[in-house]
Amino acid sequence: YLLGSPFFWITTILPRSWMLYALPVLLSVKHGIAAMTAYAYIQRFVRSRNAALIGGLLYAFSGFQLFNLFFNHFQDVTAFFPLMLIAMEESINQNRKGVFALAVALMGCINYFFFTGQAVFLVLYFIVRCFSKDFHATPKKFFRLALEAIIGVLLACFLLLPSALAILANNRITSRLYGMDMLAYNDRTRIWRIIESFF
């Protein structure tokens, strides 16, 4: 699950007795990288560097980030996610070839579980950005972007494929949901907890 995370590999070289002290430092580094990559993404759309800085800090220290501190691998994904958005913008607006494939491969390696959600988000992001005047998408660029996405997934297959096979071998995936569990959470407080995490 963590084999593609660069932060995980840092923890493997540290002595076990240091882990208690290393985790807060690593979380700080992850939040710093998240702020930096979000800043790099946001600065493309605002005039003021201060606005980009505030946006980067809001991203890095959002309710989602802080609520999920106890899952230290969540921050691995959010630290590098803006790179996918930057790569898409570069591919479409600057005709940079290969950058999107590398970003897709990186995110596919970091965490396969979050990668599926990121893929859905990027499709929605592309659709929404097509309505913007500063997004110069053409059918040719779209197909090149789709090809780069496929290449990125293929590059990440050395981690994605074993992970998929392990998940498919799990006997719990054959279980089914019945009744209201198919439509809604059975815990009545979960929705409120999700909304609460936004603040």
Residue ranges and their predicted role:
Residues 19-23, 144:
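Short alpha-helical transmembrane interface motifs in multi-pass membrane proteins
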Residues 135-141:
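Membrane-interfacial, low-structure loops and terminal tails that flank and connect transmembrane helices
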Residues 13-14, 60, 136:
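Short, flexible segments with low predicted structural confidence
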Residues 27-28, 32-45, 49-131, 144-164, ...:
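Membrane-embedded helix bundles of polyisoprenyl
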Residues 17-20, 93-94:
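Alpha-helical structural elements of signaling/regulatory helical domains
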Residues 1-17:
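Short hydrophobic/aromatic helix or loop-helix immediately within or flanking a transmembrane segment
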